[in-house]
Amino acid sequence: MSNFAIILAAGKGTRMKSDLPKVLHKVAGISMLEHVFRSVGAIQPEKTVTVVGHKAELVEEVLAGQTEFVTQSEQLGTGHAVMMTEPILEGLSGHTLVIAGDTPLITGESLKNLIDFHINHKNVATILTAETDNPFGYGRIVRNDNAEVLRIVEQKDATDFEKQIKEINTGTYVFDNERLFEALKNINTNNAQGEYYITDVIGIFRETGEKVGAYTLKDFDESLGVNDRVALATAESVMRRRINHKHMVNGVSFVNPEATYIDIDVEIAPEVQIEANVTLKGQTKIGAETVLTNGTYVVDSTIGAGAVITNSMIEESSVADGVTVGPYAHIRPNSSLGAQVHIGNFVEVKGSSIGENTKAGHLTYIGNCEVGSNVNFGAGTITVNYDGKNKYKTVIGDNVFVGSNSTIIAPVELGDNSLVGAGSTITKDVPADAIAIGRSRQINKDEYATRLPHHPKNQ
């Protein structure tokens, strides 16, 4: 039989105090909704339907082309949300997973186990449960003396006795699809919230003598539903521990994993060394035996093998094997550094390609440049690429030497093997093998200093 999935993502998330729909808040680099969608993929659903509501267009944009959408214009409870999927799923034979889009810690393995449990026990409904010493706020699982599930009771509707139950409802279920939509026609809003509860379906199945089961999570963390910023931070912390643990198992060394922040889609090769306070975001890839020191921040970039990045920022760029960057360097978007390049302290590279073995040791700005191999930039070199309205390109050939404190005003080209004298301002192309000196000739005025009031003769 087929599997189907319903993801509930219509809520506003008032307690988040945000204009962004709750399910779009990020955990480890991607939205909570994307985490849930990826985990749902473990059951290989034939159809996935996402229920949207508040700012539906933003939610649909995240999963565009990956799921069908239905709109819950008025949020009248979880049961009502599932009713919205009726035009797509009613009458189909199979098993339907219902899951909230604000549960980013649920794993695909647990959802697969839930489906298998449901099928193997021939249940009409199976509840994913968890156990906790602090069940306040959760729906409780009420069982009979034979440990069979009788019903789920919400916190506001629970008796004092029921509030003591430690087994809680995680808000994730599997149903026989056909029976689910039949039962939904019989639920009502006679409860403290005045809403249609999906949990009332469980009571209907019990009344008709149908089999209802519960599969208990091994890890309570997976049950976390994020309703505010506190829970969001908790989810971030748990996810970060999972991610770092995975990388350590795969051969990556962490000095302090609790102070290292790695997004879920980052790829890291074995033998990489990561110091504390390193952040790796987005689609970043790190090659083998690279060292990332304290304070390094990398976004959507590829770093090759054997590189050393020291307390620097790299954004949307590529760094080849054996490159050294930093400390305090900034590689801005759309830059590429060839093999064995050295970018030293207080150097900024922006929108530039730099050939192998080129060095910019300190206090240099390289913007909108095409730089060849074996180039040396002296301290204080500035490429001037902006005239207040337009940006221009500088082309520097192979084996060029740029003396310290030089200013290169684009558009300009420095030919292969050329040399720029220290302190020069370059405004014209420099031919290959030429020396360019663009500064005033030094003039010494003998004895002139004796006329100045601060000279010792005038004290």
Swiss-Prot record:
Against SUPFAM superfamilies, the record matches this protein to: Nucleotide-diphospho-sugar transferases, Trimeric LpxA-like enzymes
How the cofactor is bound: the record states:
Binds 1 Mg(2+) ion per subunit.
* Family matches, as Pfam families: Hexapep_2 (PF14602), NTP_transferase (PF00483)
Principal EC category = transferase
What are the GO MF terms of this UniProt record?
Answer: glucosamine-1-phosphate N-acetyltransferase activity; magnesium ion binding; UDP-N-acetylglucosamine diphosphorylase activity
Q: Active-site positions, per UniProt?
A: 362
Q: Which reaction does it catalyse?
A: alpha-D-glucosamine 1-phosphate + acetyl-CoA = N-acetyl-alpha-D-glucosamine 1-phosphate + CoA + H(+); N-acetyl-alpha-D-glucosamine 1-phosphate + UTP + H(+) = UDP-N-acetyl-alpha-D-glucosamine + diphosphate
The entry marks the following residues as binding UDP-N-acetyl-alpha-D-glucosamine, namely 8-11, 22, 72, 77-78, 139, 154, 169, 227, 332, 350, 365, 376
Q: Which family does it belong to?
A: In the N-terminal section; belongs to the N-acetylglucosamine-1-phosphate uridyltransferase family. In the C-terminal section; belongs to the transferase hexapeptide repeat family.
Give the quaternary structure.
Homotrimer.
Protein name per UniProt: Bifunctional protein GlmU
